[in-house]
């Protein structure tokens, strides 16, 4: 099925160029031509889903997109992109999505989809018209670099949400690019995205704190990464293999108050910017240790007092 299977809609609001792509897939257009849209356009086209058009106000981004996706054309405006496509992907910053939705003019049988991880499809309601559908398609991928993002999309998780028929189509699209679709309720997207920010950006913030503290031990950034990244990988592997609780090791499992006191003193002197982060993660680790039965509440109490903000 395709989004263009629906006909009718408001009088005088029929698609001016009915679909004729031999693949049977809806023709895709992008609003925005940044890293996300370029990577998605490349993998969609490789998977046999036709990418027909892009609308962007940035001429350099437009040129890059058209170079990456031969056969696509530049639409003169956001409102005009629907004239040549069936499925519009809105790949702009979250705060701009509602404004774009208000500008889109969808025809019956078309759909609009955004790629925000935090917002539900309801932000696209201004674009909805009779016989149209809205949804969201969020790949769990870091789009820092084009080639790496394209490679990472194969095997990635893609959160899909929105109108029933469209969600089925988006799930098929995700599968066709080698990704794993996961359906989310609209109310769950903010928590899902916050977890993604912790998993992706949070680990970088943690590494920055690690590097700051390691400088106190005479290590530069490269030296710190060489030592601590393998430890992080081991911890992640353990969590995946035996579960989060069982993967925890260190002074909080053992109840080593003296060790933690020494850490806090060193942080205060050498890396005060990382002190708050250490306390926050330490409190979480201590709770895991108690939950796991390594410490009881009486044993954990001295550590909790030590970790209180001051």
Locate predicted features.
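SAM-dependent methyltransferases
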Residues: 1-18, 275-279, 284-310
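Phosphate-coordination loops involved in phosphoryl transfer and adenosine-cofactor binding
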Residues: 24-27, 109, 155
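Hydrophobic Val/Ile/Leu positions in short beta-strands of Rossmann-like dinucleotide-binding domains
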Residues: 29-30, 90, 160
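Short phosphate-binding/catalytic loops that engage adenosine nucleotides
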Residues: 49-50, 132, 179, 219
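Rossmann-like NAD(P)(H) cofactor-binding subdomain of soluble oxidoreductases
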Residues: 59, 69-148
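Internal alpha-helical scaffold of NAD(P)-dependent oxidoreductase catalytic cores
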Residues: 62-68, 127, 148-241
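Interdomain hinge/lid region at the active-site interface
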Residues: 237-299
């Amino acid at each position: 099925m395709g989004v263009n299977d629906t006909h009718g809609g408001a009088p005088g609001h029929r698609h001016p160029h009915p679909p004729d792509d031999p693949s049977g897939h809806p023709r895709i257009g992008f609003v925005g031509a940044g890293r996300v849209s370029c990577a998605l356009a490349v993998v969609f086209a490789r998977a046999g889903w036709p990418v027909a058009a892009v609308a962007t106000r940035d001429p350099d981004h437009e040129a890059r997109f058209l170079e990456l996706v031969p056969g696509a054309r530049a639409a003169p405006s956001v409102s005009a992109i629907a004239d040549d496509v069936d499925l519009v992907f809105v790949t702009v910053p979250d705060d701009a999505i509602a404004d774009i939705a208000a500008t889109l003019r969808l025809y019956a049988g078309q759909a609009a989809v955004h790629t925000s991880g935090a917002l539900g499809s309801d932000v696209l309601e201004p674009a909805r018209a009779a016989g149209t559908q809205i949804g969201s398609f969020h790949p769990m991928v870091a789009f820092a670099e084009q080639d790496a993002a394209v490679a990472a999309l194969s095997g990635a998780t893609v959160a899909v949400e929105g109108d029933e028929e469209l969600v089925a189509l988006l799930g098929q699209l995700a599968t066709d690019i080698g990704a794993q679709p996961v359906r989310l309720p609209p109310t769950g997207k903010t928590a899902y995205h916050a977890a993604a920010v912790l998993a992706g950006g949070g680990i970088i913030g943690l590494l920055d704190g690690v590097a700051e503290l390691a400088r106190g031990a005479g290590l530069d950034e490269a030296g710190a990464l060489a030592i601590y990244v393998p430890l992080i990988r081991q911890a992640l592997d353990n969590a995946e293999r035996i579960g989060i609780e069982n993967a925890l090791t260190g002074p909080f499992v053992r109840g080593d108050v003296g060790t933690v006191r020494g850490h806090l003193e060193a942080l205060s002197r050498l890396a005060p910017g990382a002190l708050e982060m250490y306390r926050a993660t330490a409190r979480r680790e201590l709770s895991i240790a108690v939950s796991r039965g390594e410490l009881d509440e009486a044993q954990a109490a001295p550590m909790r007092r030590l970790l209180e903000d001051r």
